[in-house]
A protein has these predicted regions:
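Bacterial N-terminal signal peptides that target proteins for export
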Residues: 2-13
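Low-complexity, Ser/Thr/Pro/Gly-enriched N-terminal "stalk/linker" regions
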Residues: 29-118, 143
């Protein structure tokens, strides 16, 4: 996910494309883009790297791009889809055959040359649907899943990993760092995304080869970590501190964070934004844990015949689900019953939403809750309003941000999640139009943009958001909404 680096300024509208093509390490930054005059004809050519410089090529994905291009009448939308959908494959996937003769895939986030369990699982997710059409793509996906399982077994508390034991920028963090780790921020969702990816791969392909001893050991480590972070036996083994100017990059109370009461929920030291939680029972991530444990149980039962592990996964999922019903809901004076963002079990709660996924807004997208759930519908109205302290609205657009980038910065990811979870065509159309109008004429999505000027943005190369945009457009096409897309002016 995102990481704080020294701000750098990027140039005119081809800067993003040029740097993407060269895979330059200059992307290891976050910066606001100054205003510029964009060359009108820029949208006539795609901004993908040259074919010879693309890291991974899938014929099935290329065929799908052509199919969708032919259906889209809006030239800019077709151009953006062409740039964004393959961005993970073009620029971040490092596929190889390991020393054991098996596929191994290391996936950069984009400008940061490390592999986040969350980002990598989300980045390759929309390609799973093509696995049966492309043997090399299928191998690449096996490589991602295998790498993720190995990472979990190296350290189930880490969020991001290096390509080998090479150390990195955060080795001085006051936690149990290892040279294989890029960062060791404990985030519940880091253990959920690999299960989600493996489950979807299994459902699409029927391939059970990935569910080996490494998989079983990873599930054991996930269960151990989740249980420890229920805090029933004290604070557990994990603590984290960093010498930093950013308060949300470290934990309070000597690295343990704010206290929680053991009520069955799982504590998460950090959010999917990599920011520290205020109250450690992070509600969207606990919902994600429930659905992930149930998926793991289904695999373990059907493939591994691990009866005891199946029972453990189901029991923990049930326990967390009961606790969510009791502690996650708040009776808001304006919106009625809504889900809180964070709670501590003592009765304290934080009412907000952050753009990063899992979020309250994104819960139906992840399959954690039904979009027509009454409490979710109330929550959705709340988070997309100025009653959410991290909802911003300006001349360029509106959406949810978060403390990671700060005031007045809207994350396109939140706009995408509004579209993904919407049951209203006008709302979907408005979201797509907003995304098209806030790309700063680069043809790519960015981490965030300033509410009054999309040419001021952070992270020119953020593969997850790019691929997620492509995933959204493809879903709308496949859902029969091509007329809606073609009606956008």
């Amino acid at each position: 996910m995102s990481q704080n680096k020294t701000n750098k300024l990027f140039g005119y509208c081809f800067a993003t494309a040029a740097l993407l093509c060269s895979s330059s390490s200059a992307f290891a930054s976050e910066g606001f883009m100054p205003e510029y005059t964009c060359v009108t004809d820029a949208i006539r050519k795609d901004n993908r790297p040259e074919v010879t410089k693309r890291l991974f090529r899938s014929q099935a994905v290329e065929d799908e791009i052509v199919r969708v291009q032919k259906m889209l009448k809006n030239a800019k939308l077709a151009w953006m889809f062409t740039n964004c959908f393959p961005n993970t494959l073009d620029t971040t996937v490092h596929f190889r055959i390991g020393k054991d003769g098996k596929p191994d895939t290391f996936v950069y986030t984009g400008d940061i040359h490390a592999m986040w369990l969350r980002d990598s699982g989300a980045q390759v997710w929309p390609y799973v649907q093509f696995a049966n059409k492309d043997k090399e793509l299928k191998k690449m996906l096996v490589g991602v899943i295998s790498r993720q399982l190995k990472c979990i077994n190296i350290d189930s508390y880490a969020n991001a990993f290096n390509d080998g034991p090479v150390g990195g920028d955060w080795m001085s963090d006051l936690t149990d760092m290892k040279p294989e780790l890029h960062e060791r921020k404990w985030e519940i969702d880091s253990l959920c995304y690999p299960i989600r990816l493996a489950y979807q791969y299994w459902k699409v392909t029927g391939d059970v080869s990935i569910f080996n001893d490494e998989w079983v050991q990873a599930i054991r480590n996930i269960l151990r970590t989740f249980r420890e972070q229920q805090r029933k036996e004290g604070n557990g083994t994990y603590k984290f501190q960093r010498k930093t100017e950013r308060a949300l990059d470290t934990m309070t109370n000597d690295g343990w964070g704010n206290p929680v009461k053991p009520v069955g929920l799982i504590a998460s030291a950090f959010r999917p934004s990599d920011d520290a939680t205020t109250f450690q029972f992070l509600i969207p991530s606990n919902f994600f844990a429930v659905s992930s444990l149930r998926k793991a149980a289904e695999i373990l039962e059907a493939v591994n015949k691990e009866t005891s592990l199946v029972d453990e996964c189901k029991a923990l999922a049930d326990e967390v689900q009961v606790a969510l019903k009791e502690y996650a809901v708040y009776n808001h004076p304006k919106y009625g019953q809504i889900y809180a963002f964070e709670v501590d079990g003592f009765g304290n709660r934080l009412l907000m939403d952050d753009a990063n996924i899992p979020s309250l807004l994104a819960m139906p997208y992840l399959g954690d809750i039904k979009a027509d759930d009454p409490i979710y519908k109330n929550t959705r109205r709340f988070v997309w309003s100025e009653d959410n302290p991290y909802f911003f609205k300006g001349k360029a657009g509106e959406g949810i941000g978060g403390p990671h980038v700060g005031y007045d910065m809207i994350w396109p990811m939140s706009i995408m999640m509004k579209a993904f979870t919407s049951q209203d065509n006008d709302e979907i159309k408005s979201c797509i139009k907003m995304l098209m109008d806030t790309d700063a004429d680069t043809g790519f999505m960015h981490e965030s943009f300033y509410k009054d000027n999309p040419q001021k943005f952070t992270r020119a190369w953020f593969a997850w958001q790019n691929t997620l945009f492509g995933e959204l457009i493809l879903k709308l096409v496949n859902d029969g909404k091509i007329d809606l897309l073609n009606s956008i002016q």
